[in-house]
């Protein structure tokens, strides 16, 4: 991979061991997918996929704490996927025991880590960060470092932003450094459809069934779906949604 002088300096450890390790991880990630360079993340905010404090996710919590201890901050404020349990919904003793004390016993401490690293605010927990009320709607052409599957699809297909389906933790690494590997849906060539899918149903198709059927067929390729305008129109409005 060809790096800029600044990126190479980070990789060489000139800005500390932690940032060097993050750059090394992103370089390896990019090389696995054939990236030959890194590009700047250009969106105002990021969005993280890992929002739940499962006790078994110790490596994640340890990594987050190491970033905090080293004074590493995300270059962007970020929203994050929903909490696993809505604390505003009443729960009985057994539910509290199972969910809050056993399954998600690290939830409170993990949320404190998220705040320390750059969480937008107390209400920034959502799968749909691009909604107007959330304030995290990227513009067309902006390069993102997101991981949440549905948000990545929406950002690419509806908003025209550019983002690969990154993994959890990889999302915040791109946000910390301000760079992501240049491959896949970030490139003009990678955004070109390799499948044409014609929808010829006699009634509006179920979104989950249609999406699953297309996904199982095209896998990692890019589909161009025709025929949905019959049911959804050509504008993204309440009728379409």
What are the roles of these predicted feature ranges?
Residues 1-241:
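Non-transmembrane, aqueous-exposed alpha-helical and coiled segments at domain scale
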């Amino acid at each position: 991979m060809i790096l800029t002088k600044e990126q190479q300096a980070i990789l060489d450890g000139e800005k500390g061991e932690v940032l060097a390790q993050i750059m090394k991880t992103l370089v390896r990630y990019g090389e696995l997918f054939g990236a030959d360079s890194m590009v700047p993340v250009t969106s105002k905010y990021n969005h993280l996929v890992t929002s739940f404090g499962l006790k078994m996710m110790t490596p994640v919590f340890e990594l987050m704490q190491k970033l905090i201890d080293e004074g590493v901050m995300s270059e962007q404020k970020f929203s994050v996927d929903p909490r696993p349990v809505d604390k505003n919904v009443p729960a009985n003793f057994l539910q509290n025991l199972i969910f809050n004390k056993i399954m998600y016993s690290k939830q409170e401490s993990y949320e404190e880590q998220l705040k320390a690293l750059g969480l937008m605010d107390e209400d920034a927990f959502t799968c749909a960060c691009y909604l107007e009320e959330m304030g995290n709607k990227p513009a067309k052409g902006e390069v993102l470092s997101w991981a949440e599957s549905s948000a990545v699809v929406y950002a690419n297909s509806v908003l025209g932003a550019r983002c690969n389906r990154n993994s959890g933790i990889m999302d915040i690494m791109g946000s910390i450094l301000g760079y992501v590997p240049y491959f896949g849906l970030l490139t003009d060539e990678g955004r070109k459809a390799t499948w044409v899918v014609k929808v010829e149903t006699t009634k509006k198709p179920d979104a989950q069934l249609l999406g699953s059927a297309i996904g199982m067929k095209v896998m990692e390729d890019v589909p161009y779906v025709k025929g949905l305008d019959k049911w959804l129109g050509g504008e993204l409005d309440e009728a379409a949604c």
